[in-house]
Amino acid sequence: MYFPIEKPDVWGIFKKRLNRFVGLAEIDGVETLVHIHDPGRLQELLFPGAMIWARRKQRGKTQYYLTAVELDDELVLIDPAAHNKVTSWLIEAGFLLRGYAIERYEPAFGKGRFDLLLRGPNGQRALVEVKGVTLEAGGRALFPDAPTSRGARHMEELAKAVTEGFEAHVIFLVFRKRAKVFSPNWEMDRKFAEALVRAYRSGVYIHAVKLEMFKWGLRYIEELPIDLLAL
């Protein structure tokens, strides 16, 4: 069983990143602009000469939408727009949170929104926030790879949801094949790491799910152990 991914239209060679959301790549022998939906730094993936896969866009200033990076022996998904669908598949297929049903997408809470609202096997309401992980170092999957005040705020809101009677979960989708354990990236963003630890101590459940990408889909591999301590 696997999660299907829309087949990219083209492959190319990455040249450089122009800003958070735009990169320059050579596709079919022509330098062209590529939309990068992931705001992370992605320095270990998007380096000059990296092979990328992309879909054509119908409108906008960029001609292509980055889908994945192909390294020597692994494909890495770079498409945050797919994260909620992947998580829904994991739940519906019984790989994660068995017995839960998806009740709503992007439910409102406080002044913002989470990714999913679930109904648990005992009727409990469960709010879910999903994060994608593309950084791996020494077998350790790390999030985030760039400071994220928004991510820290999400953790604080999950903790608040627990006090208001919700069950709360944060799910980290890990897209690196060598990852053996998940940790918050204390060195990159201590505020997020501290917020995640506080959320855990407040009763928020933390999951890290390892997925392997192939052409063209994702396989569930395993849930990774969580190490919240500062390295």
From Swiss-Prot:
It comes from the Archaea. InterPro entries: SfsA, SfsA_C, SfsA_N. GO terms for molecular function: DNA binding. Belongs to the SfsA family. This is Sugar fermentation stimulation protein homolog. The gene is sfsA.
